[in-house]
């Protein structure tokens, strides 16, 4: 069983260097090709493409200028990302055996890196998958990545007893997984809040819950998708009446 999560816009590189392994991102050729494009972008280009402030545009231009796909340095991706999903995952509190297990079962989808493993060396960047960045391969990053991400996930799941891909990513990022090229059955987890008799998806809670599900899988070394139905962290419960074979709904009373 393999799970995928989205990256985060915010990063935290203040974490002390650890004794954890640092692995090389798998899609080096594509990363190098894409970094040649991003290096040419001006701050004005980035502001327009990503709808960000002048300050963030300047910061990210500096990041792209400094980015070197040949340098095998950085911080482990699962440690460096710092958003709601990663607050739920709380990887900095996982011990080494748990993180080593996650290295084989967790993948992070990325606009710049394509697919990251937890220990992969991450350099500071920001490039959302939905960015309409033109390359030789097309008008946006979905065109650029094509079938590459799906093929990489297929390879990652080889040898797993249960080949199911557990989708804990956002629609923006999972949209980069080419359905025709993917050879794995997919289960997408949805997290909803109940209030006044109605169920709603609330962004902050849903993002954190995706991270909590990833943590639940890692803590319990779950390698069969059916066992996810036992997820009960933070008050969530599986809702069989609202679920299908491909879309599993978990709900709780809204805090």
Swiss-Prot record:
InterPro entries hit by this protein: YaaA
Gene Ontology CC, one term: cytosol
Any one GO biological process: response to hydroperoxide
Highest rank taxon of the organism: Bacteria
Family recorded in the similarity comment: Belongs to the UPF0246 family.
Name of the molecule in the record: UPF0246 protein CCNA_03496
């Amino acid at each position: 069983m393999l799970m995928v999560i989205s990256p985060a816009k915010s990063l935290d590189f203040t974490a002390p260097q650890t004794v954890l392994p640092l692995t090389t991102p798998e899609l080096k050729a594509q990363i190098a090709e894409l970094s040649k494009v991003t290096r040419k972008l001006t701050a004005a280009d980035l502001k327009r493409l990503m709808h960000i402030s002048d300050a963030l545009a300047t910061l990210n231009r500096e990041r792209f200028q400094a980015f070197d796909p040949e340098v095998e340095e950085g911080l482990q991706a699962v440690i460096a990302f710092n958003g709601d999903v990663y607050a739920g995952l709380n990887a900095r509190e996982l011990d080494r055996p748990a993180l080593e297990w996650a290295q084989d079962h967790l993948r992070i989808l990325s606009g710049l890196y394509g697919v990251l493993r937890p220990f992969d060396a991450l350099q500071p960047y920001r490039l959302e998958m939905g960015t309409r960045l033109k390359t030789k391969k097309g008008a946006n990053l979905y065109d650029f990545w094509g079938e590459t991400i799906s093929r990489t996930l297929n390879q990652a799941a080889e040898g797993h007893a249960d080949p199911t891909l557990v989708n804990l990513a956002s629609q923006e990022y999972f949209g980069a997984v080419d359905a025709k090229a993917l050879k794995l059955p997919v289960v997408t987890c949805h997290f909803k809040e109940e209030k006044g008799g109605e169920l709603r998806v609330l962004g902050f809670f849903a993002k954190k819950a995706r991270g909590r599900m990833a943590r639940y899988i890692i803590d319990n070394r779950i390698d069969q998708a059916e066992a996810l139905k036992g997820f009960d962290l933070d008050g969530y419960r599986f809702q069989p009446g609202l679920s299908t074979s491909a879309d599993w709904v978990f709900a709780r009373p809204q805090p």
